[in-house]
Structure formats: structure tokens, C-alpha cells
């Protein structure tokens, strides 16, 4: 028995009743637990018909050509990212979802700055796995589609949804590789995607749950389970005071939640004293704006203002799982930015760890204040590279939207490494200027050495980067402003609506490539 794709009304009924109800006459309950996702390419000029992937062609032969037959009579050829579901073709797979992969020849697109073929696979596999999830099947086998890592990323990222606090949850679907393809690449893709999903979970969690202390505990648990080559230091307020991090403390003092300075070490190099890479992440677990309070509309999204800390810590957890032969240190100043009688006031002057004084003209420009001290501290490790990530400015969202992470760097070498990694992952970056033009706007300050706002309203992302540069002496430093990529509405088809966890996979890929270059 085999069935055509169901019309909309029938699909609704199917989801209400459960797919098992269709099979009382044929398959046992044990057979009802597995779906299959297979790929098909768009027709090239030399093709008579659209071509299946290798796995798709093998399955079509297994069912005596019926999959091709059903595709031919069920509608027009599948476009990239579109799906079509068939039922009853094979007893091992009650539901088979065919997904459109676009052109087989798709590769690196120099205009889009990504690998189009890999992106097509991620989007198509995600769509197919969600179809299986909607049918309430607990497992799915996935065609590697010519790139098992991209397929795994599409499956794991596409199936993830934050429902930790809901009583009614979606069916948890276990995805595994179909056939005897490249299992190593598949597992690598699962690892990359799981790293991004950890960042998504941290960013999506409500601020009353994901406090600075709780954030540090979650990372400690994940890091210690990832590798024995790790250390976690959860620094308290007294340590922060000893380090004379006055800029960080000035933000934290407005909240009842105690601040935490999270310091994580992964020592993967055979030489434990080898200079590390240092990642720094902004960790504002809720940003009300402080005395310069934000508008209430969408303020709830500011639970994810610790996205920088979430992405850099998740990337280091993933690097530890990969057992990369390098040393990495992660630093995350964690606190809330709240209004109170103790909070920073516009016009206050605070002193950073390096002795520079800062005039705080807007308390909602707090991310740069906590990063200033963390960047100063990063230099004490004599690192090879310093990279910080932060949901820093609304101006970056205005400039690039969700299309790419903005990168400000004083090193073309470092820019090229980040860019190459982003092309591979599809989570893109775009270089932004670090001109002295912007530096002059933040050092033109009435009361202190530097102002936490630019002199003018224009180029807010650039003046924020210029501010951070005042606390950096290292010649290989990059600032990633991830404000524009913090959330996903519908722009990235393999991510559901919500917090994106970007650019975690690009950071993991950067670390992987750096480790290969070092060895």
C-alpha cells in the first residue's frame, strides 16, 4: 500500500489522530516510529528528470521505482527547501519526506559569501525533519545529501525548540544518519549544531531563571562533562573588587542579583603553558537600560543580552568536545542592568581596570562598560588572539540586520580567518570600520578620559567599537557585534523563531581551523 501526499485537511486530521491510525490494516506499532528524509536535486540542463541523491536513488530502487512514480504524479518538481511526504512506501519507514536540495552544482557564492549547496542542505533537511516531528514520529533517518555535516546541522538545528518550561512539549525526535555514509562528518555536524543549541537555550531562558549565577553553573556543568582538560572559576563580587573592575561593578550595583565573573579554561595543547586564545563575551542577563530605561515594547528580548557570553562559552564547550589541541580561555562578566537607588546615573564617572576613567552619559550603553574591564583582564594571559562577542548596539541591527555579524578588527589576518570560517558555516560575518574618525568621537569627553557614547548619534556601532578599542593593546583583536543576529524571525529557514545562538558555529569553525593551522 502507498498513499499520495495528503491534502491540507487530511494532514490536520492526521496530526490530531497520529499517524499510527492510518496503519491499522498494515503495519505494527513497532513500525510506526521512524521517518525517512531523502533529497532530490533540481533538474540540470543535462537531466531528463530531477535526480535523487545516492541514498534517494537506492531507496527508489528498493521500492521498485514507486517513489519516483509518486513524485511525478503528485505535483511539480520540488524547489529548494520544499518538501513532499509519502506514506506506506516501505514497512520500515511509514513516512518518507522528499526534500528539494536545489542544484547539485551549487557551491561557494562569492556574492552571498556562503556555500549555497551547504545552506540548501541545512534548510531542506530541517524542513523534512520538522515534517516527521509534526507526524509525532520519535525518530528519523536522514539522507547525508552529499554533505553529512550540513545535513546533521540542518536536522539538529531545525528540530530544536525551547519548550523547557512548557507542560505540553513537541515530540522529541532523534535524528540519525541514513545508510553507511560519512558518520564522522555527521557526528561533527551534530556537535556543531548542539553547540549552537546550547547558546539558544541560554539566550531563550527567562531572566529570573538564567541569573548570572545560574548561567555560570550551566556552563560549568557542560564544560566539565565535555572534557577533563577544563577548569572553571566562578569569581564573586569580592574578587571583582580586588581586580579593580570599577566599570563592571558600576553596572552590576543597580541589581539585587550578585555579579559573577566567569573564567573558563580549556587546556588542549600538549604544552600547557602555550599562549591561549581568549574569548570574551558580554553577559548582561537582563538589560532594562538602567536609569536610561528602555521602552517597554520588546524589553523581554533583553533576557538574551548575554548572547555574547552564551556564544563564546558554547563554542569553547564544543572545542573541548572536539579535543582541539589548543589552549582557550573564556571570560564572561555577568550581571543585570537595572534601575535602582544604587544604579549608575547619567553623568557618573567610573574607573576601569586599566585606570582609564569613563563618563557614563547613557546607562543603557552598559555592555561596553563591562567588556572594558574584561578586555583589560584578557591581556594578562598573553594571548595569541582576543575575540569578544556582544549584543552591543541597536545600530548594528539597523546597519546589517540579521544578514551577518558585524566584525571590527585591527588585524586583517584575523578578519580573513573569521570570514573563511563563516563561509563554511553559512553564519556570515561582515567587516566594519575601526577608523580614528570614530575614536575621536568617544575621547572628546568633558569629565573623563572616554565617554560611553559617541559625540554624535550617527554610527553607533562604530563608536561602540572605538570605545572598546581604548581598552585593547593587542594587535590581533576582533569585536563581534551580534545584536542584529540575536533573534531569528523567519530569515534563517533551519532555525525556528526565537533566539538564534549565532554565530556559535562560526566561532567553532574558527577554532577548528586555528588548531589545524597551529599543528
UniProtKB/Swiss-Prot annotation:
Enzyme Commission number, as recorded: 3.4.11.1, 3.4.13.23, 3.4.11.5
Binding site for Zn(2+) 2: 282, 287, 305, 366
Residues engaged in binding Zn(2+) 1: 287, 364, 366
Swiss-Prot/TrEMBL keywords: Acetylation, Aminopeptidase, Cytoplasm, Hydrolase, Magnesium, Manganese, Metal-binding, Phosphoprotein, Protease, Zinc
Compartments in which it is found: Cytoplasm
Residues noted as binding Zn(2+) 3 in the record, renumbered to the chain: 202-203, 303
PANTHER family: CYTOSOL AMINOPEPTIDASE, LEUCINE AMINOPEPTIDASE-RELATED
Modified residues (N6-succinyllysine): 45, 61, 103, 221, 455, 476, 489
Regulation of activity: Bimane-S-cysteinylglycine-hydrolyzing activity is inhibited by o-phenanthroline or bestatin, and is activated by the addition of zinc chloride.
Primary location class: cytoplasm
Role this protein plays: Cytosolic metallopeptidase that catalyzes the removal of unsubstituted N-terminal hydrophobic amino acids from various peptides. The presence of Zn(2+) ions is essential for the peptidase activity, and the association with other cofactors can modulate the substrate spectificity of the enzyme. For instance, in the presence of Mn(2+), it displays a specific Cys-Gly hydrolyzing activity of Cys-Gly-S-conjugates. Involved in the metabolism of glutathione and in the degradation of glutathione S-conjugates, which may play a role in the control of the cell redox status.
Family named by the database record: Belongs to the peptidase M17 family.
MF-aspect GO terms: carboxypeptidase activity; manganese ion binding; metalloaminopeptidase activity; peptidase activity
Xref: Gene3D superfamilies: Leucine Aminopeptidase, subunit E, domain 1, Zn peptidases
Protein name (database record): Cytosol aminopeptidase
Pfam family of the protein (one): Peptidase_M17
Amino acid at each position: 500500500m502507498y498513499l499520495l501526499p495528503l491534502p491540507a485537511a487530511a494532514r490536520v486530521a492526521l496530526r490530531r489522530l497520529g499517524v499510527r491510525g492510518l496503519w491499522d490494516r498494515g503495519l505494527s506499532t513497532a513500525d510506526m516510529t521512524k521517518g525517512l528524509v531523502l533529497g532530490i536535486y533540481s533538474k540540470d540542463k543535462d537531466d531528463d528528470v530531477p535526480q535523487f541523491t545516492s541514498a534517494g536513488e537506492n531507496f527508489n530502487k528498493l521500492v521498485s521505482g514507486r517513489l519516483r512514480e509518486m513524485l511525478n504524479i503528485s505535483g511539480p518538481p520540488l524547489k529548494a527547501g520544499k518538501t513532499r511526504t509519502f506514506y506506506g512506501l516501505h514497512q520500515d519507514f511509514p513516512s518518507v519526506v522528499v526534500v528539494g536540495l536545489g542544484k547539485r552544482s551549487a557551491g561557494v557564492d562569492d556574492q552571498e559569501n556562503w556555500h549555497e549547496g551547504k545552506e540548501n542542505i541545512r534548510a531542506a533537511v530541517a524542513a523534512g525533519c520538522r515534517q516527521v516531528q509534526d507526524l509525532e514520529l520519535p525518530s528519523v533517518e536522514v539522507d547525508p545529501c552529499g554533505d553529512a555535516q550540513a545535513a546533521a546541522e540542518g536536522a539538529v538545528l531545525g528540530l530544536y525548540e525551547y519548550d523547557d518550561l512548557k507542560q505540553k512539549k513537541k515530540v522529541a525526535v532523534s535524528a540519525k544518519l541514513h545508510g553507511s555514509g560519512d558518520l564522522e562528518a555527521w557526528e561533527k555536524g551534530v556537535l556543531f549544531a548542539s553547540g549552537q543549541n546550547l547558546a539558544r537555550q541560554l539566550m531563550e531562558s527567562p531572566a529570573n531563571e538564567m541569573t548570572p549565577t545560574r548561567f555560570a553553573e550551566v556552563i560549568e556543568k557542560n564544560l566539565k562533562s565535555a572534557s577533563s582538560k577544563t577548569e572553571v572559576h566562578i569569581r564573586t563580587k569580592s574578587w571583582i573588587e580586588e581586580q579593580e573592575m570599577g566599570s563592571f561593578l558600576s553596572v552590576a550595583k543597580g541589581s539585587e542579583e550578585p555579579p559573577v565573573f566567569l573564567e573558563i579554561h580549556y587546556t588542549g595543547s600538549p604544552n600547557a603553558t602555550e599562549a591561549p586564545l581568549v574569548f570574551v563575551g558580554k553577559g548582561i542577563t537582563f538589560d532594562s537600560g538602567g536609569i536610561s530605561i528602555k521602552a517597554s515594547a520588546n524589553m523581554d528580548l533583553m533576557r538574551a543580552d548575554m548572547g555574547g557570553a552564551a556564544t563564546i562559552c558554547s563554542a569553547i564547550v564544543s572545542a573541548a568536545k572536539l579535543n582541539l589541541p589548543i589552549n582557550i580561555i573564556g571570560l564572561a562578566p555577568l550581571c543585570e542592568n537595572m534601575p535602582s537607588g544604587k544604579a549608575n546615573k547619567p553623568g557618573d564617572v567610573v574607573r576601569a581596570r586599566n585606570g582609564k576613567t569613563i563618563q557614563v552619559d547613557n546607562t543603557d550603553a552598559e555592555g561596553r562598560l563591562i567588556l572594558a574591564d574584561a578586555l583589560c583582564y584578557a591581556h594578562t594571559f598573553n594571548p595569541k588572539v582576543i575575540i569578544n562577542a556582544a549584543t552591543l548596539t541597536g545600530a548594528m541591527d539597523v546597519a546589517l540586520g540579521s544578514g551577518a555579524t558585524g566584525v571590527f578588527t585591527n588585524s586583517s589576518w584575523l578578519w580573513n580567518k573569521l570570514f573563511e570560517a563563516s563561509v563554511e558555516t553559512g553564519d556570515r560575518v561582515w567587516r566594519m570600520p575601526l577608523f580614528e574618525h570614530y575614536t575621536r568621537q568617544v575621547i572628546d569627553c568633558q569629565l573623563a578620559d572616554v565617554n560611553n557614547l559617541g559625540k554624535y548619534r550617527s554610527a553607533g556601532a562604530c563608536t561602540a567599537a572605538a570605545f572598546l578599542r581604548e581598552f585593547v593593546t593587542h594587535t590581533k583583536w576582533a569585536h563581534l557585534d551580534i545584536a542584529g543576529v540575536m533573534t531569528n524571525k523567519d530569515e534563517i529557514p533551519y532555525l525556528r523563531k526565537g533566539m538564534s545562538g549565532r554565530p556559535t558555529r562560526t566561532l567553532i569553525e574558527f577554532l577548528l581551523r586555528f588548531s589545524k593551522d597551529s599543528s
